[in-house]
Amino acid sequence: MTNLIRSNFQDHPFHLVSPSPWPLNTSVCLLNLTTTGALSMHNFNNIHYLYYIALIGLVSAMFLWFRDIISEGTFLGDHTLAVQRGLNLGIILFIVSEALFFLAIFWAFFHSALTPTVELGAQWPPIGIEPVNPFELPLLNTVILLSSGATITYAHHALIKGEREGALYGSIATILLAIIFTGFQGVEYSVSSFTISDGAFGTCFFFSTGFHGIHVIIGTIFLAVALWRIFAYHLTDNHHVGFEGGILYWHFVDVVWLFLYISVYYWGS
């Protein structure tokens, strides 16, 4: 006869999360990371050591947080259909909030570009600024990023069809293209004739493209975790919320880059 304890069961499909230190840990590390990053730009002595400590702490907290979520969803069965719907809604709302953030960035760019002040020479780009040629490295990066969107879509459809090998190859191709894109973006910054300190043009250019680059790095980590989970047989054809969230996020990154290329690189030059 099985001895069942009523307190071990629940009469609802939702996941009541246990107390976790990782949200607070991650928040503190993010605060230290942004603070030390800002201070390092003002030449505070040895502040970069604290920056690296905060970065290591953030990566460690993310790893441990991912570990707990994977255990809850894959091995403990806490991610029911109701929980999956909630997670999908949370991902969508997060992407909407990010879209509004980029809207503010584009607003700042067009405000400066459409009504250039006397200090900028009453023209855009300002006098003395040589903008990046949109038909060179930016165009190549556009092709690379759009190609990565196609490969991750292929991986998604392969996983739905139960073709694990196709999902692995598609995800690997996407991550490689993302790394190449990030590398080319770094090359573009290193050879640029202007900096973030060169007035409104430099600030808008580097802030918009740099913030997008941060999102590319975050999306790459997102997809790398999903790739490992596919390799470890964690994901199935009907239970892969994390992978779908990473794909939605990646398509959002693609769309934002198209707007950046058209407005900042092409029209803005």
From Swiss-Prot:
Principal place of residence: mitochondrion
Residue intervals on the Mitochondrial intermembrane side: 42-48, 115-137, 189-201, 266-269
Subcellular location: Mitochondrion inner membrane
Reactions performed catalytically: 4 Fe(II)-[cytochrome c] + O2 + 8 H(+)(in) = 4 Fe(III)-[cytochrome c] + 2 H2O + 4 H(+)(out)
Gene label: cox-3
Entry's transmembrane regions: 23-41, 49-73, 81-114, 138-161, 165-188, 202-230, 249-265
Biological role: Component of the cytochrome c oxidase, the last enzyme in the mitochondrial electron transport chain which drives oxidative phosphorylation. The respiratory chain contains 3 multisubunit complexes succinate dehydrogenase (complex II, CII), ubiquinol-cytochrome c oxidoreductase (cytochrome b-c1 complex, complex III, CIII) and cytochrome c oxidase (complex IV, CIV), that cooperate to transfer electrons derived from NADH and succinate to molecular oxygen, creating an electrochemical gradient over the inner membrane that drives transmembrane transport and the ATP synthase.
EC number(s) given by UniProt: 7.1.1.9
Oligomer and partners: Component of the cytochrome c oxidase (complex IV, CIV), a multisubunit enzyme composed of 11 subunits. The complex is composed of a catalytic core of 3 subunits Cox1, Cox2 and Cox3, encoded in the mitochondrial DNA, and 8 supernumerary subunits Cox4, Cox5a/Cox5, Cox6, Cox7, Cox8, Cox7a/Cox9, Cox6b/Cox12 and Cox6a/Cox13, which are encoded in the nuclear genome.
GO biological process, one term: mitochondrial electron transport, cytochrome c to oxygen
Membrane topology term: Multi-pass membrane protein
Recorded GO MF terms: cytochrome-c oxidase activity; ubiquinone binding
Keyword terms of this UniProt record: Membrane, Mitochondrion, Mitochondrion inner membrane, Translocase, Transmembrane, Transmembrane helix
This protein's name: Cytochrome c oxidase subunit 3
GO cellular component terms listed in the entry, alphabetical order: mitochondrial inner membrane; mitochondrion; respiratory chain complex IV
Keyword Membrane among record annotations: yes
